[in-house]
């Protein structure tokens, strides 16, 4: 039995056949229009398929400043005779240096709302493991008018791959209110997102954006106020330059979220005359944790190329669908199939062709198929 290697090792090539059938032509044209709209308009333009994105990193510096004049006789202070739904305490009028602790925190910020101050001494050697400090006197106080203190937020962002770097003063910015609207503040005290000005926000305004009322119920114990127990807030700073087609325009947006079911307190110890005498501060506070995030985009030719190549794949699929419809489902499928698929003569026959006359004869035979 002779093996026909020409049939076994046959090569399939592409043949272009123009089928004059309006049904197939309209279908293929519709596919083509949809693919062009998807690839060019949606993927490349609307979805910015020419852009590669990355998440920026950054740094935060904060500082606290007390107002020129603190409000006295607040409802939560003992010297105020008006009713208050929670426990009243004596009020102290501290400046920013005493209200802020810990100092130098590069990822967060803490402003005290209540402190329990204990005068403690020890009458034995601290080298003795059973030696303990004893509290002589204790005082529980509110820090009055902490809402009027202002916090300055100096932030910087950097995108490593595109090497885009800006300070917050150079950018336009916004803060989300409780309804999720982006607003820009340019008031006498509160300034957010104004180019050339630092971001400054009163703690009371910041709490308002988070939906927090210091004189509302505590997040862990409804019998206390948030002022009494403290709270934790996430302050997200989201950077973006993909909101428009101009990648040189960068904005940032603050969004402030409270952490449910949390209180906050931090201890502070001040040594007095010697290590046997100390002041112990248990501070309850507003704890702000800053998180810098976002999406920074830059032009990338490879991203654009991948977007366009995906369109070529869709064109191939659409052509395959129309071809299968033509050769398998239409009434003229046998005719269309015979036009699309054609088998040449064996290579043995071609070896007999030694001049142009033989090639012309083979060509006419193929045309007659």
Swiss-Prot record:
It is found in: Contractile vacuole membrane. It comes from the Eukaryota. Keywords: Ion channel, Ion transport, Ligand-gated ion channel, Membrane, Receptor, Transmembrane, Transmembrane helix, Transport, Vacuole. One of its GO terms (cellular component) is contractile vacuolar membrane. Its main location: membrane. Gene3D superfamilies: atp-gated p2x4 ion channel. Residues 1-25 are cytoplasmic. Residues 283-296 are annotated as: Pore-forming motif. One of its GO terms (molecular function) is ATP-gated ion channel activity. The chain crosses the membrane at residues 26-46. Disruption phenotype: Null cells are still capable of osmoregulation and do not show any noticeable differences in their sensitivity to hypotonic conditions. Quintuple p2xA/p2xB/p2XC/p2xd/p2xE null cells exhibit a slight delay in their osmoregulatory response, but are still capable of regulating their cell volume in water. Extracellular purinergic response to ATP persists in the quintuple null cells and p2xB null cells with no alteration in the kinetics of the response, but the magnitude of the response is lower. Residues 47-369 are lumenal. GO terms for biological process: calcium ion transmembrane transport; cellular hypotonic response; monoatomic ion transport; regulation of calcium-mediated signaling. P2X receptors are ATP-gated ion channels that play a role in intracellular calcium signaling. Not required for the purinergic response to extracellular nucleotides. Not essential for osmoregulation. Inward currents are evoked by intracellular ATP and ATP analogs. Insensitive to the P2 receptor antagonists PPADS and suramin, and also copper ions. Inhibited by sodium ions. Permeable to chloride ions. PANTHER family: P2X PURINOCEPTOR (PTHR10125), P2X RECEPTOR A-RELATED (PTHR10125:SF27). Belongs to the P2X receptor family. This is P2X receptor B. It comes from Dictyostelium discoideum. The gene is p2xB.
């Amino acid at each position: 039995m002779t093996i026909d290697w020409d049939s076994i090792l046959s090569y399939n090539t592409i043949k272009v056949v123009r089928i004059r059938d309006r049904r197939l032509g309209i279908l293929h044209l519709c596919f083509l229009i949809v693919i062009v709209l998807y690839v060019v308009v949606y993927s490349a333009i609307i979805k910015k398929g020419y852009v590669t994105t990355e998440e920026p990193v950054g740094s935060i510096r904060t500082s606290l400043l007390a107002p020129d004049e603190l409000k006295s006789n607040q409802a939560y202070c003992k010297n105020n005779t008006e009713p208050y739904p929670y426990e009243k305490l004596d009020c102290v009028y501290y400046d920013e240096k005493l209200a802020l602790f810990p100092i130098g925190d590069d990822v967060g910020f803490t402003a005290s709302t209540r402190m329990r101050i204990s005068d403690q001494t020890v009458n034995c050697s601290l080298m003795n493991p059973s030696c303990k400090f004893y509290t002589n006197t204790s005082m529980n106080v509110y820090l009055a008018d902490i809402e009027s203190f202002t916090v300055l937020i100096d932030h910087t962002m950097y995108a490593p791959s595109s090497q885009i770097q800006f300070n917050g003063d150079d950018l336009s910015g916004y803060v989300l209110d409780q309804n999720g609207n982006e607003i820009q503040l340019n008031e006498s005290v509160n300034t957010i997102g104004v180019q050339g000005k630092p971001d400054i926000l009163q703690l009371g305004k910041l709490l308002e954006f988070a939906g927090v009322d210091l004189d509302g119920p505590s997040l862990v114990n409804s019998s206390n106020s948030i002022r009494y127990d403290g709270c934790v807030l996430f302050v997200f700073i989201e950077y973006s330059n993909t909101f428009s087609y101009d990648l040189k325009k960068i904005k940032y947006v603050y969004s402030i979220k409270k952490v449910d079911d949390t209180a906050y307190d931090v201890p502070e110890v001040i040594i007095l005359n010697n290590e046997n005498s100390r002041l112990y501060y248990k501070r309850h506070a507003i704890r702000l944790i800053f998180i810098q995030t976002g999406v920074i985009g830059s032009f990338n030719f490879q991203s654009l190329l991948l977007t366009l190549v995906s369109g070529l794949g869709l064109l191939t699929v659409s052509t395959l669908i129309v071809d299968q419809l033509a050769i398998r489902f239409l009434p003229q499928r046998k005719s269309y199939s015979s036009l699309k698929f054609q088998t040449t003569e064996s290579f043995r026959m071609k070896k007999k062709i030694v001049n142009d006359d033989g090639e012309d004869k083979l060509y006419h035979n193929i045309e007659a198929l």
